[in-house]
Amino acid sequence: MMKKRIFLLLLIFCLGLGGCGKKEEQTKKKTTATEEVGIASKDAMLTLSMRIPETLNPLLNREETVDRILKLLFLPLLDFDESGKACPAVAQNWEFSADGRSLSMNLNSNIRWQDGTALTADDVVYSVNTLRNAPEDAVYKQVMNYVSGCSKTGTNSVVITFRDSFSSNIDALRFPIIPAGYYSGQSDTNTKPVGDGPYEMESYQQASEMKLKASASYYGSTPQISEIRVKMTAGEETDINAFEQGMTDVLVTNAMDAGKYADESVSGMHQFTSNQYDFIGFNFRKELWKDKSVRQAVAYAVPRDNLKESVYLNYAAMTNTPINPKSWLYEENVATYEYNPTMATTFLKNSGWTDADKDGKLEKEISGIRQSLRATILVNQENAGRVQIASKLKEELTAIGFEVTLDKVDFETYQQSLESGQFDLVVG
């Protein structure tokens, strides 16, 4: 029987309209594919890939592909279902204080580490402190923008304190927990992880391969797949080549590469919606965008259906807010702006923008001076999809009377321009 390989397609939800003013940090959120792919036999083996790790400590790790593998070895403090609601993991139950600034949590007393010791509150406190001292670009470091501390209140209970009373504080608690006794007393823990998840490390070959096996100490159900082999790769191109040559069984990819793997006799595609999103943002420091009618005109000029098809090959979910459409927080009943150039033109006209000299470009007298309707669109040139969006937006805005400059820059310059406010619109 031919082994059927799968690739997991990240569906981004795309093209909300937002504003860029004061910078706010956001916890990076991740989702994982949970769709069942047939039923594996007990002796089945799966081959995955990840980058060559600097460390296998999940709280110090800086690489997302490594994090995906480490999720098999370490349980998070809290898990989250497909709709974004918190579910038990290391924490069994929890309750917020009246002011929302602290969270009391009871831990699952049945969880044991793979060295045989029991998980306790000391491990949670140690994990938070480890994360506090982690590199700034560690995968879970942004958790500390929300969490201010963690204290032990019992053998299996802790209190998490937050910097502010914020509705999404609980979302920050998806970071993994590590055993204090092991990681505080060993010198070679970077390549010998001890976790509490469904798998444990069986062997490790530096810069080559890691083997995982189903963990005998895992408190939950025994995994259907008993062995996982993890190939270490240099980059995304290597991942793709390994999958195409049958060296790995799973490839996580995005909409841009989906068409390559449409032959379901060789591979099966299983889609999941990530929390990544592309958007068009206004720089509200600019006087132009203080006029709601002009902002509405831009919204009506965005051909979202066309972009969904041409840029994302229809592998995207559109949203009108920066919230995953599958989330329990997503609100359906909000104002929407379907593509309507005629409506866009009407809003500009009602705001006083006219084409007096019939050159196709709109002007307006402001403080006694005739000014043209101009906008600069900022986009980072490394992201081909966003460049396509920016180019199409330029075309559409030009058609309704804007003079548009497309500012395609490298990522470092892009970041600097965002910080300094040197843009009118941004595709991000």
Where are the model-predicted features located?
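Aromatic- and charge-enriched surface segment that lines or borders ligand/interaction sites
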Residues: 92-136, 288
